[in-house]
A protein has these predicted regions:
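A cross-kingdom feature that marks ATP-driven nucleic-acid transaction machinery
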Residues: 297-472
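Phosphate-binding site recognition
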Residues: 1-334
């Protein structure tokens, strides 16, 4: 698969390269493309790339010496038995002293597991050997908890050394769609499953129908993604069963903290740490209405599975593991036939629309400078009054309210009228008193002529078809 997006991340890395001494920490969940980003960055630079593995420290030093030997084209280095990391780092510092070099240590947490003192060793190497010798250091790792503890935390020996950090997230829909040769509907449905995780996307690049790709990659016992959530959680947490229970409860439609607790038959105080960890890992998101002025302390929070594939897995795979173990994949395909597009994809489409809106604003195709993009729902009744896309432009005192329709029919005036009614809620008008309201309708299937005519006469009504502003 070709390299996609990551413009901002590459800009950060190139800016750090221009510094006197850049120390960058890159972290993020597995499969998200950290190594691919690094290799794209170093492809035209003098770079030492070392991938740590689960091996003894002596073996790691021997392999690192091999990297140094091949990069410097000095075969003698691979024959030396190094016993001190400082000596290895000195080779990097001495290589082409007048040329900027990049040293990458990928899967850094494995070195810490082998030797807990490695962060202190690296701190000493950076301070005494690397920092003032034209070296840019990149530490990378997938074990988010360990990267935070050993590379970013206040009590880490490396604290204060980093000059930048990148938490790599899945690709946005707009970046993925721009690089694909797919129809909008095909792209949305694929993204609803992969969530923009590059490794997952690799398995959905064929011309075969999506349902066959799902059967082969996800539903087959031998499929790459059949047990993916197990692998992800087992690497990051010590009691995966508790985290599984939380994810299952949320996937079953329990989004309030109290409901999650009731489903698990536990006090909310007991499950809060699990939710916090799942949020840190990027598997769960805590949403609050756009009206909340202090989101972190809001009592109106709702929790959702933010990882599209994990949401798909808990909806269509986990409940049918017994049947799938017996190679009965048809039962899942029948279940998908009931609501995959109407509910599962339609839900993912809402977050896709928020991304599309942000991108259209960034490009200047919508005259709006969002300070915050989210959604809104009535504070009493979960799901009663819901606005899919809600954004605030505090600079110009404007409020954007959008409705997303993922169905085959063109959107009609009735949808606009209903959105206007929602926009007059007492809570919204009180929270954004004096703000001008701009309405937006998102559709994959276009709009009726009557609605198009109405939008032509109303500058505060914006129609977005697929990923572009609709203009008559």
């Amino acid at each position: 698969m070709d390299f996609i997006g990551r413009t901002s991340e590459l800009a950060t890395l190139n800016a750090e390269l221009e510094r006197g001494s850049g120390f960058v920490v890159i972290y993020g969940r597995r499969r998200v493309g950290k190594t691919t980003l690094i290799k794209e960055f170093i492809k035209d630079k003098r770079a030492f790339y070392f991938l740590a593995t689960t091996e003894s420290e002596a073996q790691s030093m021997k392999r690192f010496a091999g990297v140094l030997s091949r990069t410097t084209k000095n075969p003698m280095l691979s024959k030396v038995t190094f016993t001190d990391w400082l000596d290895l780092f000195q080779v990097v510092a001495d290589d082409h002293p007048d040329e900027k070099k990049v040293l990458v240590i990928d899967e850094f947490p494995y070195l810490v597991k082998t030797n807990p003192d490695f962060p202190s060793i690296l701190q000493n190497a950076w301070d005494e050997v690397l920092k003032d010798h034209n070296v840019m250091l990149i530490l990378c790792g997938s074990l988010i908890s360990m990267m935070k503890k050993h590379a970013l935390a206040y009590d880490s020996p490396l604290y204060g050394r980093r000059t930048a950090q990148i938490r790599l997230m899945p690709l946005q829909f707009t970046d993925v769609y721009a690089a694909q040769n797919l129809s909008f509907e095909q792209a949305v449905e694929q993204y609803a499953i992969t969530g923009g995780v590059p490794k997952y996307m690799e398995f959905f690049q064929t011309d075969e129908p999506l349902v066959e790709q799902i059967r082969r990659v996800v539903l087959s016992k031998n499929g790459f993604l059949y047990e993916e959530p197990d692998f992800l959680l087992n690497e990051e947490v010590q009691t995966p069963i508790n985290y599984f229970s939380v994810l299952k409860a949320i996937s079953d439609g329990n989004h309030k903290l109290s409901k999650i607790g009731m489903t698990m038959e536990q006090d909310t105080s007991a499950i809060t740490p699990y939710l916090k960890t799942l949020i840190d890992l990027g598997f769960v998101i805590k949403n609050v209405p756009i009206t909340e002025k202090n989101p972190e302390r809001s009592r109106k929070s709702l929790y959702y599975v933010s990882d599209n594939f994990i949401r798909f897995w808990f909806r269509y795979v986990y409940p049918f593991k017994g049947e799938l173990e017996l190679d009965n994949q048809q039962i899942v395909l029948d279940e998908m036939g009931k609501d995959f597009k109407q509910k599962f994809v339609a839900f993912a489409y809402e977050s896709i629309c928020r991304n599309i809106f942000a991108e259209l604003c960034r490009k200047g195709q919508i005259d709006f400078e969002p300070s915050r993009i989210g959604s809104y729902w009535c504070n009493d009744n979960e799901g009663d009054t819901e606005i899919d896309v809600a954004a605030v432009d505090n600079q110009h005192k404007r409020l954007f309210l959008g409705e997303c329709k993922y169905h085959a029919k063109p959107v009609d005036v009735a949808v606009y009228s209903a959105l206007q009614e929602k926009g007059q809620s007492k809570e919204l008008t009180a929270a954004f008193k004096g703000y001008e309201i701009v309405y937006g309708l998102f559709s994959k299937s276009g709009f009726t002529d009557r609605l198009v005519e109405m939008a032509a006469e109303n500058s505060n009504l914006i129609l977005i078809q697929e990923d572009a502003v609709y203009r008559k």
